[in-house]
Amino acid sequence: MIDAAQIDHLTALARLELSPAERRTMQQDLTRMLGYFEQLGRVPTEGVQEMQRPVSLVNVLRDDAPGETFPSGVVSALAPETQDGFIRVPRTVDTE
């Protein structure tokens, strides 16, 4: 079971400020999670071969082949604003 000192330590590391109710909930949730790990630790695994990956490495992507595209004039005509053949869009990343 997780005790109050461990909750204090975890909240300090995570820089969390929790109400008493949130602390109780966190303590209960973490205790329950650790209980699940204890259950997993008791599963008999003798004779079970370890896996490097849970799934086989198979490329499920299609071949990269050129296909039909729209002429640039059609796409540019649909864009609200263009400049030098490129579509202008609002800035999404600050450079500062």
Swiss-Prot record:
It catalyses: L-glutamyl-tRNA(Gln) + L-glutamine + ATP + H2O = L-glutaminyl-tRNA(Gln) + L-glutamate + ADP + phosphate + H(+); L-aspartyl-tRNA(Asn) + L-glutamine + ATP + H2O = L-asparaginyl-tRNA(Asn) + L-glutamate + ADP + phosphate + 2 H(+). Pfam families: GatC. One of its GO terms (biological process) is regulation of translational fidelity. The keyword NAD does not apply. Keywords: ATP-binding, Ligase, Nucleotide-binding, Protein biosynthesis. Gene3D superfamilies: Glu-tRNAGln amidotransferase C subunit, N-terminal domain (1.10.20.60). The keyword Phosphoprotein does not apply. InterPro entries: Asp/Glu-ADT_sf_sub_c, GatC. It comes from the Bacteria. Its EC number is 6.3.5.-. GO terms for molecular function: asparaginyl-tRNA synthase (glutamine-hydrolyzing) activity; ATP binding; glutaminyl-tRNA synthase (glutamine-hydrolyzing) activity. Heterotrimer of A, B and C subunits. PANTHER family: GLUTAMYL-TRNA(GLN) AMIDOTRANSFERASE SUBUNIT C, MITOCHONDRIAL (PTHR15004:SF0). Belongs to the GatC family. NCBIfam families: gatC (TIGR00135). Allows the formation of correctly charged Asn-tRNA(Asn) or Gln-tRNA(Gln) through the transamidation of misacylated Asp-tRNA(Asn) or Glu-tRNA(Gln) in organisms which lack either or both of asparaginyl-tRNA or glutaminyl-tRNA synthetases. The reaction takes place in the presence of glutamine and ATP through an activated phospho-Asp-tRNA(Asn) or phospho-Glu-tRNA(Gln). HAMAP family: GatC. This is Glutamyl-tRNA(Gln) amidotransferase subunit C.
